[in-house]
Amino acid sequence: METFLFTSESVNEGHPDKLCDQISDAVLDACLQQDPDSKVACETCTKTNMVMVFGEITTKANVDYEKIVRDTCREIGFVSDDVGLDADNCKVLVNIEQQSPDIAQGVHGHLTKRPEEIGAGDQGHMFGYATDETPELMPLSHVLATKLGARLTEVRKNGTCPWLRPDGKTQVTVEYHNDGGARVPIRVHTVLISTQHDETVTNDEIAADLKEHVIKPVIPEKYLDEKTIFHLNPSGRFVIGGPHGDAGLTGRKIIIDTYGGWGAHGGGAFSGKDPTKVDRSGAYIVRQAAKSIVANGLARRCIVQVSYAIGVPEPLSVFVDTYGTGKIPDREILKIVKENFDFRPGMISINLDLKRGGNGRFLKTAAYGHFGRDDPDFTWEVVKPLKWEKTQA
């Protein structure tokens, strides 16, 4: 049997880039909670002892940006300079302006347009992907890397591994078999974890704890064998981390946010953007489309692309490819997608309830992936029953 290796990585919530994603989405949540029509484009950057939020926000909401920054950093675990950032004593800089009136009139006619008339907030193309290799209909390499990162945070916060610090990265290589275009995982080839730690712990203790408390509970036994390679803190030392170790910036982990290198990516980031930004809403609706195609048995694996022009409601193009796994021709599936999904930005917002912020709704998306999550707030993960003539099959 011919096999191949494919690798996906993840970072956990204490990684500086992910810290920035979470702050940007916490700001979005705060704006949408008070004013669902908020227009938000919020970027964050961080380096030693400093966090800056900047961008364009037009909202009726009364938002305390500094408090959101400090609360988000504290919740992640950045509570002292030792761990990489002190939430209560770091410098917080804010440079927020209103959305450009040129963009505003082109996209939503200064709020005079009906939902179906609202134009895309920018040009761009987005991809949605789904595969039947996991219950989440997500790639296994990505699912495992993401879950390892989430588990690292869990055992840090619940005290199981008190030597852990917030920053950390994971990477998983899976050996796959190509089954007529579908992807069948055979085994896990390599597991890599690099996690920030305190000064007291030894490398042997780190390796033992990571195997017992992180890898064992996450990776199903059937995928591990005596040949599986483990790289556990291979650099030997990772005490300095968070923004002290590396600068961070919103939108730098777009593959981790999506499909771990599978499918394709149009390049647009998600965090800190309200649903008129098709980088986000467009990517969410094509994930729902791709997932629904696979879940309804139309294909085992699928990618959907949509593209937009600024100020224009209707998409410029929609594309479907089932990698040869479709039960009916791709052109028929494309027809079904167009009949069952409304790709106009204003309608995506309504159908996926994307104007509802607050309660950490979008903050939750900003760590451990936007897709494949079992959470009612992730409305784009709901499978749509597709209307199609079974006689076509």
UniProtKB/Swiss-Prot annotation:
L-methionine binds at E56, Q99, D246, K277. One of its GO terms (biological process) is S-adenosylmethionine biosynthetic process. Binds 2 divalent ions per subunit. The metal ions interact primarily with the substrate. Can utilize magnesium, manganese or cobalt (in vitro). Its main location: cytoplasm. It comes from the Eukaryota. Keywords: ATP-binding, Cobalt, Cytoplasm, Magnesium, Metal-binding, Nucleotide-binding, One-carbon metabolism, Potassium, Transferase. Pfam families: S-AdoMet_synt_C (PF02773), S-AdoMet_synt_M (PF02772), S-AdoMet_synt_N (PF00438). Mg(2+) binds at E9. InterPro entries: ADOMET_SYNTHASE_CS, S-AdoMet_synt_C, S-AdoMet_synt_central, S-AdoMet_synt_N, S-AdoMet_synthetase, S-AdoMet_synthetase_sfam. K(+) binds at E43. It catalyses: L-methionine + ATP + H2O = S-adenosyl-L-methionine + phosphate + diphosphate. SUPFAM superfamilies: S-adenosylmethionine synthetase (SSF55973). Its EC number is 2.5.1.6. It is an enzyme of class 2 (transferase). CDD domains: S-AdoMet_synt. Pathway: Amino-acid biosynthesis; S-adenosyl-L-methionine biosynthesis; S-adenosyl-L-methionine from L-methionine: step 1/1. Coiled coil: none annotated. Homotetramer. HAMAP family: S_AdoMet_synth1 (MF_00086). Catalyzes the formation of S-adenosylmethionine from methionine and ATP. The reaction comprises two steps that are both catalyzed by the same enzyme: formation of S-adenosylmethionine (AdoMet) and triphosphate, and subsequent hydrolysis of the triphosphate. This is S-adenosylmethionine synthase 2. It comes from Vitis vinifera (Grape). The lineage of its organism: Eukaryota, Viridiplantae, Streptophyta, Embryophyta, Tracheophyta.
